[in-house]
């Protein structure tokens, strides 16, 4: 979902280079230098307004997190939160999730989160889905051998597509939930803004976790 333009976004981003990078060219393999401690790095591709990634950073201080978002207006909202929170284990990246291998080195990432990604329902837009094979190849290249991919959505069609796509790519499923909020995983689940809103309306949330062979 595209947010309304925020006239103040560009200035806020320019004022906080220690918290956010804009399509950097020389950051691959150097992300640890941007954090207070050298810890495993986890990224969320398509972070929206940032509720998930900021709460994850607060809950897991022994991990480093990077919010990857292509919309300036969206990442500016996350940056507002980070300016206030000043979490030492959170960095922001304004950039295209289709270019992750430009921003991250091989084996630099311990895990990838995809939360409520745009389903791009039309067949001609299949290549834009974040679980399309070209994206899976991007994640694989930057992920450590022990890393994982976690994906949540309320869109049944996208979930079924993603199961088929990951399976065709040769990934191994560690967990599949057809009703996350009524499963054993619900207690530790950190919700996105979107997830919170629609789960209250009774919308079923789907989740999977998988790794590369």
Swiss-Prot record:
Entry-linked SUPFAM superfamilies: S-adenosyl-L-methionine-dependent methyltransferases (SSF53335)
Binding site for substrate: 122, 154, 192-195
This protein's record includes keyword Transferase: yes
Catalytic residues of the enzyme: 118
Signal peptide limits: none
Residue numbers binding S-adenosyl-L-methionine: 44, 69, 96, 118
Gene Ontology MF terms: tRNA (guanine(46)-N7)-methyltransferase activity
Coiled-coil stretches: none
Keyword list, A-Z: Methyltransferase, S-adenosyl-L-methionine, Transferase, tRNA processing
Gene3D superfamilies: Vaccinia Virus protein VP39 (3.40.50.150)
Entry EC no(s): 2.1.1.33
Classification via InterPro entries: SAM-dependent_MTases_sf, tRNA_(Gua-N-7)_MeTrfase_Trmb, tRNA_methyltr_TrmB_bact
Protein name per Swiss-Prot or TrEMBL: tRNA (guanine-N(7)-)-methyltransferase
């Amino acid at each position: 979902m595209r947010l309304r333009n925020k006239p103040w976004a560009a200035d806020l981003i320019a004022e906080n280079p220690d918290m956010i990078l804009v399509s950097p060219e020389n950051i691959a393999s150097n992300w640890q230098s941007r954090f207070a401690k050298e810890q495993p790095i986890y990224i969320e591709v398509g972070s929206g307004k940032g509720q998930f990634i900021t709460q994850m950073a607060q809950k897991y201080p022994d991990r480093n997190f990077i919010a990857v978002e292509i919309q300036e207006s969206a990442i500016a909202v996350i940056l507002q939160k980070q300016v206030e929170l000043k979490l030492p284990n959170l960095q922001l990246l304004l950039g295209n999730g289709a270019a992750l291998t430009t921003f991250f080195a091989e084996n630099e990432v311990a895990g990838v989160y995809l939360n409520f990604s745009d389903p791009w329902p039309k067949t001609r837009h299949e290549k834009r889905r974040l679980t399309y094979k070209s994206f899976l190849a991007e994640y694989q290249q930057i992920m450590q051998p022990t890393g994982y991919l976690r994906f949540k959505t309320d869109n049944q069609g996208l979930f079924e597509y993603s199961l088929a796509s990951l399976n065709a790519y040769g990934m191994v499923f560690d967990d599949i939930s057809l009703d996350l909020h009524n499963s054993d995983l619900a207690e530790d689940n950190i919700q996105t803004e979107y997830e919170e809103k629609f789960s209250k309306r009774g919308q079923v949330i789907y989740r999977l976790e998988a790794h590369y062979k």
